[in-house]
Amino acid sequence: FGSGFKVKYHENDITTNIEDLGAKIGDRFREFCKSYGRELTLVFEPGKFLVSESGYLLVRTNVIKQTTATVFCGVDSGQNHLIRPMMYDAYHHITNVSNPGGIERIYTVVGYICETDTFGWDRKLNEVREGDVLVLHNAGAYGYSMSSNYNSRYRPAEVLIHNGKAKLIRRRENLDDLLATQIEAEL
């Protein structure tokens, strides 16, 4: 069976009750095996269900820019790190962890890539200031695997939190990483 298990992105999203689903499928599968006269193996490809909610993208605010219609919050990341909002119009909840008690305001959170690089349009966030850290939720699925070095940008580090302790599991890329696969051509 393949993916499709629901993950909660919006507050009122329907999620998959994995225990209930497992019980129902398990019962029917055992009945099928019995009627088929053979023991079979049932395998699931869980997709984003296992990892989406366990990953967060932390970004730092570089600039706040007010226009006549919009307040933009520019951050030090972009679609090269989390392309889902741009590619699929996917919603990722955003939280300002640097100012949890701040007054709610409306921001459009944008990245540093030159195209229309937007993480979230017209989002209610606690007041955002330059230097504040924002958290993009549900970034565990496909974040790294869909990331790129577009515009010669480095991929970020990945940190695992286990039993309250942080452990670096993937270092941030650097210029050597960008150049590592290039071969000097003799012309």
Q: What role is predicted for each listed range?
A:
Residues L21-C33:
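Alpha-helix-loop-beta-strand connector modules within alpha/beta enzyme cores
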Residues F1-K6, P46-K48:
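Glycine-rich beta-strand-to-loop/alpha-helix junction loops that act as flexible
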Residues H10-E19:
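Glycine-rich tight-turn/loop motif centered on a GG-T
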Residues G37-L187:
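Charged (often Lys/Glu-rich) extended helix/loop segments that serve as interaction or gating elements
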Residues F1-G4, S35, L160:
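Short intrinsically disordered, low-complexity coil segments enriched in acidic
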